[in-house]
Every structure is written in structure tokens, then in C-alpha cells.
A protein has these predicted regions:
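P-loop NTPase motor domains
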Residues: 5-224
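Conserved lysine of the Walker
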Residues: 2
Length: 224
């Protein structure tokens, strides 16, 4: 069938030294490829599966790109996931939160709720950001801090409703909560000079979404 053909093509490309990415909605294809990989390719393979007891982490706010670009790309993913219920206030708050965390340099997606609800943590993140960008993020956080507690809860409620189904799940927090995961996507696209190193970077990435175990929204976020 189609899965058998896809597995054959992926293995063929891997054997030929090409970079391979397989995103599998069900997980069966990833399992098939992983069990058939030649031994010499195993060290160059990353299997991303949120169902693992100790999953490989993904930090979309870090890894080989500018903080602002990382924040914008992740914002676009959330906007596409929740297009039917996306509003300007949610856009504004999430954008400022992602930018602030990405510019921090050691943050993760799982910190967004903490940033919005914990004053002490928020000050530790936004202090330097406000100084460096007083007209942009500085103005946003000044507005946010000026809100009453009730106004703040009302403002962030739509965003928190979107984040909770993902970040309340332990296996997804284990994936998105790693600030410095061992694998970053930019490693897959490193130049050929890096491939000549004694420890070559990953060339094969197998992503098991397993929608039945993760849920639609979580699987879409992981796949994006």
C-alpha cells in the first residue's frame, strides 16, 4: 500500500545520504521505518514522539534563527490552528509574549501562561526587554501592568483557553517545555561542512503525531 511505498522511498533516500523528514499522523509509518533503518543510520536519526516516556524536545522559540522570526512563525501556527476564534486581543497578547520569551534566549512555549499570570516571573522576563524596546514591547507591558487583576484575567482568557488543552498535558509539556533540547530543526539543514565532523548531525527526523493519543490540536501544533 501507500505506507509501504513511502517507507521504501524514505529508506532509499536515507541510504543515499539525503536528509529525510517523515511526519506521520498515525505513527505506524514511523515505527516501520525505524525498525528497518540500517544500524549505521541510527545515530543520525531523531524520533519525535510525544507518547515516549522521555520524548525528544522541541523548542520553537530557539534554535538557529532570529528571536523575532521564531516568535512570528509560532504566532502564525497558532493563528492557523484557531482561525475560527482568533481575535486582535489574542493576537496582540500572544505576539508580545512570544517575542519577550524568544528574546530572553532560554525560554520555552510552556512559559507563556506563567509569563501572563505570575508577576514575579513576568518582571524577570520583561525587565531587560522593556529597556531595549521601550516603544514596542515596553509599551505593551506597561499597558498590561496597568490593568486591574480582573481586567487582566478577562484579557488573557481567550488565549489561555487555547493554550490549556496543549500545555496541561504532561507529555506535551515534556516536548514543548524543554528550554535547550538536544535536537533543533536547524541542525537538520546544517551545511555539508558540518556533516564531515566526527559526530555528524541528524539527517533523518521521524515525527509520530498519533492523533488518537494526542488529540487534534496538539497533533497539529506538533506537526506544524
Amino acid at each position: 500500500g501507500k505506507s509501504t511505498l513511502l517507507a521504501h522511498l524514505a529508506l532509499q533516500d536515507a541510504e543515499a545520504g539525503r536528509r529525510v523528514v517523515v511526519i506521520d499522523p498515525k505513527g505506524d509509518l514511523v515505527t516501520d521505518i525505524a525498525t528497518r533503518l540500517p544500524a549505521h543510520l541510527v545515530r543520525q536519526t531523531v524520533i519525535l514522539d510525544a507518547a515516549d516516556a522521555q520524548p525528544v524536545g522541541v523548542n520553537p522559540l530557539a534554535g538557529g534563527q532570529s528571536p523575532d522570526l521564531a516568535a512570528d512563525l509560532l504566532l502564525g501556527v497558532f493563528r492557523s490552528l484557531y482561525a475560527d476564534s482568533w481575535g486582535p486581543r489574542t493576537q496582540d497578547i500572544l505576539h508580545a509574549s512570544l517575542l519577550s520569551l524568544a528574546r530572553r534566549g532560554d525560554a520555552s512555549l510552556a512559559m507563556v501562561p506563567l509569563l501572563l499570570t505570575n508577576p514575579g516571573f513576568r518582571r524577570s522576563v520583561t525587565g531587560s526587554v522593556v529597556q531595549r524596546d521601550p516603544l514596542g514591547l515596553g509599551a505593551f507591558w506597561a499597558w498590561y501592568e496597568a490593568l486591574s487583576e480582573a481586567e487582566r484575567r478577562q484579557a488573557i482568557a481567550p488565549l489561555m483557553n487555547k493554550l490549556r488543552p496543549i500545555l496541561l498535558r504532561p507529555q506535551l509539556r515534556a516536548v514543548f517545555g524543554q528550554r535547550s533540547p538536544k535536537f533543533a530543526w536547524h541542525q537538520l539543514f546544517a551545511d555539508d561542512a558540518a556533516d564531515n565532523a566526527q559526530e555528524p548531525g541528524p539527517r533523518i527526523v521521524l515525527v509520530s503525531l498519533a492523533k488518537g493519543a494526542l488529540g487534534r490540536e496538539a497533533a497539529q501544533l506538533l506537526g506544524s
